From Swiss-Prot:
Keyword field: Glycosyltransferase, Transferase
Pfam families per UniProt: EarP
Free-text comment about domains: Adopts a GT-B fold and acts as an inverting enzyme that converts the beta-configuration in the dTDP-beta-L-rhamnose donor to the alpha configuration in the N-linked (Rha) arginine product.
Name of the protein in question: Protein-arginine rhamnosyltransferase
Protein's job: Protein-arginine rhamnosyltransferase that catalyzes the transfer of a single rhamnose to elongation factor P (EF-P) on 'Lys-32', a modification required for EF-P-dependent rescue of polyproline stalled ribosomes.
Assigned EC number: 2.4.1.-
InterPro entries: EarP (IPR016633)
Species, as recorded: Shewanella oneidensis (strain ATCC 700550 / JCM 31522 / CIP 106686 / LMG 19005 / NCIMB 14063 / MR-1)
GO molecular function, one term: protein-arginine rhamnosyltransferase activity
Length: 395
């Protein structure tokens, strides 16, 4: 494959840290920049095996390939594909650029400073107040080049949120016809799910909260509509090993585990469009990393955010900041219980999780209505790609 470049292209470098979160965000951004702004994008990724789980047609053995108009290069050490400076250089989530790239930038700065790309560090999404003041700030590097911090966020003063131009219209059209979700479940090999059943998707880290919820759902399912929990192989299922008939690694996509009237369904991996549609089709979504966290919000369905645990419980500060924003227009009693449910889930508090789930009834109409209204409030008139393009033009 040709790796020729021109001065107008953008490079995005991404290291895969949490299997799918980081690459999920950068892959969506790369596709949107190509599709909506016709910007040539080269995406450098260090772990193509993980990437292939959300892009099944990707060949992890190739050093360079193209999908959706995006050139995908395998980020090797040293680089197997030469880096050719373009207009913009994006470090996703503070990844460390390859030495040969930094050396090339330093040389360019000395010999042809006008050819140095605009260098951006795409940061993690946060709802904390300090993000407004830090977005767009420059940091002088040893080479003498400025690197700018680009912070996604929920306010007009931040870098915005990744959201494709037609996403909400596609979601609304999908959700208007119940047949769509049933056809999706069938295509994923998920059997015996009826339109009136309660369906929950689970994409969390390991946690004691999941066995607690499964215990609750088993008991409730005897008196209510059947409950289906949809889980991919991986970290969520590890928490339920004691309920499974075999080791997690031995489970197959489409397999069912019946626990009374609660049924666990093993999900196959799917591409990003399939994942979006899955979230659109479930009554409640339990999500984790940045990509699934944001897509659960765009799904306009109630959700629980299992935030990535950090030292000194800093993740709980980030969780509180988001909950404060999300609950701003929510009735105080529902906001209080939804907040407590999220905190209890992220801390593995089994008794509290069951109590707050029962108190909240997450598929209740007020919370569902709020979930439908939230995406319009959160987008704040402009998405991340739009703001990013504007930022580059102004810089």
């Amino acid at each position: 494959m040709s790796t020729s470049s021109n001065a107008s292209h953008w490079d995005i470098f991404c290291t895969v840290v949490d299997n799918y979160g980081d690459i999920g965000v950068t892959w969506r951004l790369a596709k949107q920049l190509v599709n909506e702004y016709h910007i040539p994008i080269i995406l450098w990724v260090d772990d193509l095996n993980s990437f292939s789980h959300i892009l099944p047609t990707l060949n992890p053995k190739l050093v360079s390939q193209c999908f959706n108009g995006v050139i995908i290069n395998h980020w090797t050490t040293p680089l197997a594909v030469p880096y050719l400076p373009g207009k913009v250089l994006i470090e996703a989530f503070a990844c460390e650029l390859p030495d040969e790239v930094k050396l090339q930038l330093a040389t360019l700065h000395k010999t042809a400073p006008q050819a140095v790309p605009l260098w951006l560090n795409l940061e993690y999404l946060s709802a904390e107040d300090w993000v407004d003041g830090c977005h767009g700030l420059p940091s002088m590097q040893v080479s003498g080049i400025k690197k700018y911090f680009y912070f996604p966020g929920f306010t007009p003063k931040t870098g915005g949120l990744i959201c494709e131009r037609e996403l909400f219209a596609e979601r609304d059209a999908w959700q208007q016809d119940p047949a769509n979700k049933l056809q999706l479940f069938e295509s994923l090999g998920l059997k015996d799910i009826q339109a009136q059943d309660s369906v929950f998707s689970i994409f969390s880290y390991e946690t004691d909260s999941l066995p607690a919820l499964c215990e609750l759902w088993q008991a409730r399912a005897k008196n209510d509509a059947k409950i289906h929990a949809l889980l991919p192989k991986g970290r969520s299922l590890n928490s339920l090993q004691h309920l499974l008939p075999c080791p997690v690694d031995a489970l197959m996509p489409g397999q069912q585990i019946k626990l009374g009237d609660l049924t666990l369904h093993i999900l196959p991996m799917t591409d990003q469009q399939g994942f979006d549609r899955l979230l659109w089709s479930c009554d409640v979504n339990i999500v984790r990393g940045e990509d699934s966290f944001l897509r659960a919000q765009w799904a306009a369905k109630p959700f629980i955010w299992h935030i990535y645990p950090q030292e000194d419980d800093y993740h709980l500060i980030k969780l509180e900041a988001f909950i404060r924003l999300y609950c701003d227009n929510l009735a105080p009693d529902i906001a209080d219980t939804w907040s407590k449910l999220n905190f209890a889930f992220s801390q593995g508090q089994q008794s509290a999780v069951k109590t707050h789930w029962q108190n909240l009834n997450p598929v209740s109409l007020p919370l569902l209505q709020h979930a439908k209204e939230w995406p319009i409030d959160a987008i704040n008139a402009a998405d991340l790609a739009t703001r990013l393009v504007q930022f580059v033009k102004k810089s």
